[in-house]
Amino acid sequence: MKKLNICLLNDSFPPVIDGVANAVLNYAAHIQKSLGNALVVTPDYPGAKDDYAFPVIRYQSFNTEKLVGYRTGNPLSSGLLKKIGEHDIDIIHTHCPLISGYIARMLRETTSAPI
């Protein structure tokens, strides 16, 4: 069976500690270990250390932590879709309907991968 390249998009990921960030971390680790290749795409957090067994693409974000508790990613970050496309994505998983969902829809148009 062909190993799949699965892109996981989420508006939060460690160093954020919440249930959704942990779920995406666990999904990516399981995919990388057992199913294929995981790629996590998430907003940038200053000082984030991405020393995982899978690649993490962080894109430009704005500090909205005092307003909403999280940073807000810029889905129009220069070169973001090109960077993701270099990973030959087979499946797109988005765990959030907002910014990550928007990026997933743009990515679907450029890769034809299902969401």
Residue ranges and their predicted role:
Residues 63-94, 99-102, 106, 110:
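An amphipathic, basic-hydrophobic alpha-helix
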Residues 6, 56, 91, 106-115:
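Active-site proximal beta-strand in glycosyltransferases
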Residues 1-61, 85-87:
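N-terminal subdomain of nucleotide-sugar transferases
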Residues 39-44, 93-94, 114-115:
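Short beta-strand segments at enzyme active-site cores
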